[in-house]
Amino acid sequence: MQLNVTHRTNAERLEKHNRELETALAKKTEEHKEQAKALLLLQDDMLANQIQLNVLEQKTEALQQENETLVQRLVAKAAADADKMNDANAFLER
């Protein structure tokens, strides 16, 4: 009789331990799902930020090229104005 009680007690302990492990597994599985969702959100944010960065880099490049063109035009105009003033001064000095 003692052997049956011992086996029953061991079986009950094992069943309880099994339930605890199943509960822990379910909890870890849920945590994993939440972490996977968070990871997907972060990856989506990172992709959106990368796209925004690419667009801004393209705009920056275009603005730098436009600025270079405008500076060249300004320098050319200043040189032309200086040439006109030099020609006018040379004419007045004659």
UniProtKB/Swiss-Prot annotation:
Keyword RNA-binding: no
InterPro entries, per the entry: Autophagy-rel_prot_16_dom
Locations listed in the record: Preautophagosomal structure membrane
Predominant place of localization: membrane
Assigned keywords, A-Z: Autophagy, Coiled coil, Membrane, Protein transport, Transport
Pfam (any one): ATG16
Superkingdom of the source species: Eukaryota
Gene Ontology cellular component list: phagophore assembly site membrane
Region forming the signal peptide: none
Membrane topology (UniProt): Peripheral membrane protein
One BP term from GO: protein transport
Ranges in a coiled coil: 2-77
Role description: Stabilizes the ATG5-ATG12 conjugate which is necessary for autophagy. The ATG5-ATG12/ATG16 complex is required for efficient promotion of ATG8-conjugation to phosphatidylethanolamine and ATG8 localization to the pre-autophagosomal structure (PAS). Also recruits ATG3 to the PAS. Involved in endoplasmic reticulum-specific autophagic process and is essential for the survival of cells subjected to severe ER stress.
Assembly: Homodimer. Part of the ATG5-ATG12/ATG16 complex. Several units of each may be present in this complex.
Family the UniProt entry places it in: Belongs to the ATG16 family.
Protein name, entry field: Autophagy protein 16
Organism per entry: Yarrowia lipolytica (strain CLIB 122 / E 150) (Yeast)
